[in-house]
Amino acid sequence: MGAGNFLTALEVPVAALAGAASDRRASCERVSPPPPLPHFRLPPLPRSRLPGPVSRPEPGAPLLGCWLQWGAPSPGPLCLLFRLCSCTCFAPLPAGADMDPNPRAALERQQLRLRERQKFFEDILQPETEFVFPLSHLHLESQRPPIGSISSMEVNVDTLEQVELIDLGDPDAADVFLPCEDPPPTPQSSGMDNHLEELSLPVPTSDRTTSRTSSSSSSDSSTNLHSPNPSDDGADTPLAQSDEEEERGDGGAEPGACS
């Protein structure tokens, strides 16, 4: 290939590229809308509503809020959402913010805050519960005997005034406030009385003991009369002496010794 042919081959693409650029510039100039009239211009957004610094928009890179002005191409909803998220959610954090030097302490602080918040809501939302006695207290209360005296908390002021006005020397008036009836027996006291009755034994009196000794002596004499003769058997049969006769013999011997 000669040198002249190489130069002509380079000149043709350069001319084609220059023509394409001029056609694109001409098409952009034709598409751009005409400048709006002054009375159709919208008021700009306040400085607090804008996410970034307020600057004049460039024709190639529109910012958020610049599409409200006439003459600027409006971005699509996806582009607007992406710019909003990039300004709010994906803002760069300061250096060292994501790297906590003591993550365990940070976790404990977070758990402590959650615990305090939970306790606060429990105190507000949950109703106050009354104190309930255990079942053992109820069982002991049922077995206790009734209280006979009036408690200091149950005394009425009117009752005390009436007691002061009434003459206690009068038995009829005193019976109103001081009943003489015996208190009803409690189950524990009645059970103890029954045990005492079972354990107590009747003690014989002197008349009963003398009658018993006379009857025993008469029965012994009758048995001696009906008993066989000792000479018949050839051997004496010993007779059992009762304890009462021994006591009687001891009692009869003592006064003789004293005399």
UniProtKB/Swiss-Prot annotation:
It comes from the Eukaryota. It holds the Pfam family Dysbindin. The modification Phosphothreonine is found at T237. Residues 205-223 have a biased composition (Low complexity). The modification Phosphoserine is found at S217, S218, S242. Keywords: Phosphoprotein. The keyword Phosphoprotein applies. GO terms for molecular function: ATPase binding. Residues 27-56, 174-259 are annotated as: Disordered. GO terms for biological process: apoptotic process; ERK1 and ERK2 cascade; monoatomic ion homeostasis; negative regulation of protein kinase activity; neuron projection development; regulation of signal transduction. InterPro entries: Dysbindin. Disulfide bonds: none annotated. Detected in brain. Residues 32-46 have a biased composition (Pro residues). May modulate the activity of casein kinase-1. Inhibits CSNK1D autophosphorylation (in vitro). Belongs to the dysbindin family. This is Dysbindin domain-containing protein 2. It comes from Homo sapiens (Human).
